[in-house]
Amino acid sequence: TKACGPGEWVSYFRGGPRHTKAHLDEAIDASLARLQTDYVDLYQLHWPDRRTNFFGQLGYTHDQDAEETPIDDILTALESLVVSGKVRAIGLSNETPWGVMTFLEIARREGLPVVASIQNPYSLLNRTFEIGLAEIAHRESVGLLAYSPLAFGVLSGKYLEGARPAGARLTLFDRFSRYSNPEATRATEAYAQLAKAHGLTLTEMALAFVTSRPFLTSNIIGATSLEQLKENID
């Protein structure tokens, strides 16, 4: 499970969620109660508690006045959850190369829990992970839990030729336009032709690409029907 970071869109969580000890303690206790369990194997920070760019945002803007929780304080808070037995391992999500390396450096220097994984987007349409994070994941043993391997379903091919299937994500939510720009559409069309030439569905090829990466630990598939689930697993 995860603890979300700060953001106006989640201000109703805990009066404005942060990664302070008080917030993380409250968040894990609530998660354990909902899950009806005494512990979780992996506890992730959903996005950073500092001003940086994530969720597909390009460009970093520094704001020296922005509030943020120091990473050593975050790790100390997470250590208490590990010691208490509520959490077995910790992970990051939607993190940057600087963030991952800083978490690792402080943890090793101070004897605090070392990050085990990072859950970031990765697909044939989003390979930004390869720029600075792939080598870190591989050499530092911080396994990638790749989310959105089908790029919001675009790499299933269901949106080709302008189609908008009823109930599909991009049909319901126009704001998810990250993978529906002209460049992504042209790339998807080319990938579909390549998959067909090799006797594969676009979904099969897209998922196989992600799964074959040496820095991958888990490919997080998503399905809304048994048919989709079968194709994802096959």
What positions do the PLM features span?
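Surface-exposed, active-site-proximal loop segments in enzymatic domains
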Residues: 5-20, 51-60
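Beta/alpha (TIM)-barrel catalytic core signal, keyed to glycine-rich beta->alpha loops juxtaposed to Asp/Glu
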Residues: 48-234
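Non-cysteine beta-strand/loop elements that form the S-adenosyl-L-methionine
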Residues: 1-2, 41-45, 145-149
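Intrinsic disorder/low-complexity segments
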Residues: 10, 26-28, 174-177
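A short, structured active-site edge motif that brings together acidic residues
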Residues: 1-8, 118-122
